[in-house]
Every structure is written in structure tokens, then in C-alpha cells.
């Protein structure tokens, strides 16, 4: 319940297969999971150390392990995959609105995003399409991205409901 990566995986599977088939798939997948982690990048790190055969993760985390020299190959499901969108917001009525807007514009500028995303430390894709990504970052044009429903699956009550169903119907199944 603590990993956003795990929730994105669950939401993706439910969107691809539909609720009934998606939950059936999750129950079958559960039997093959070695460890559930609290960190979204932990499964692929364990895979790199040889503790798991497969690690479900965001692509940039897999590529990062490969760049470290670990025996990890990153692939995307042919059925499609969900994704994350890094974002930032300004709180309505902020005391320092002018400065907040300045920082916002600065952080999202092509120059700053190019600097951050080509430093070799982050293999995520910049949110500003005019910024350059690290050459090793995943090429989203080669990946079958689903039409992820952020409105539905980003809703707090939907998330709580799905995680409750996971706790009650999937996590209790013996492995």
C-alpha cells in the first residue's frame, strides 16, 4: 500500500483487462511474487542482485540498473503499460505567489529540465517537451502507453477502494 509504482501497476492491469479479468490476473500474479516492497525501485534492484527473475518497475528504474552494470534488460508489455507523470503545483492563496510562480516557471523551463534530465542521474522523461532527455532515457514513442485514466485512478477514494480490495482479496491468498 505504500508504493506508488505498485498502485500504478494495479491500476494499469485493471484498465487493460477490465475489473474482473484484471483481479483474476492479479491473483495469479500474486502466486509468483517473491516479495512486496515499500519502494517502487526495490524490485528491479533485487532483480539486479539476482534475488528475483523479474522486477516490475518504471522503465527509468530498470535502465538505471542496466547503466550500473547489473544484468537487467528492460522490456514493456505488448498489451500496453501505464506511466507516471511528475508534476508540481502552486498552492492556491500561497503567501509568496509571485516567487512561487517564478520558481515554477524556472523549474519547468527547457534549460533547467534539460540540465536535470541529462545529468545522468535521472532517466525519467522531462515534462517539458522542449527539454532534452538523457539519451538512455526510455523512448516513449517506442512504448505502447495505455490511455491511462488519471481522473478515475488518481482519485483518493478509488485508490483506497482498490487497495482495500487488494488487501482483502489478493494479499491473503497463500503463496
PLM feature spans:
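Mature extracytoplasmic/periplasmic domains
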Residues: 82, 86, 91-147
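Conserved C-terminal helix/tail region of periplasmic/extracytoplasmic solute-binding proteins
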Residues: 147-175
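Solvent-exposed loop/turn segments at secondary-structure junctions
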Residues: 2-5, 60-63, 79-82, 95, ...
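Extracytoplasmic ligand-binding site segments that recognize negatively charged/polar headgroups
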Residues: 1-51
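Short, hydrophobic alpha-helical packing/hinge segments within bilobed ligand-binding/sensory domains
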Residues: 43-44, 62, 100, 113
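A ligand-binding cleft/hinge motif common to bilobed small-molecule-binding domains
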Residues: 53-71
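Sec-exported extracytoplasmic/periplasmic mature domains
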Residues: 14-19, 31-34, 48, 52, ...
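Periplasmic-binding protein-like
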Residues: 8, 25-30, 68-92
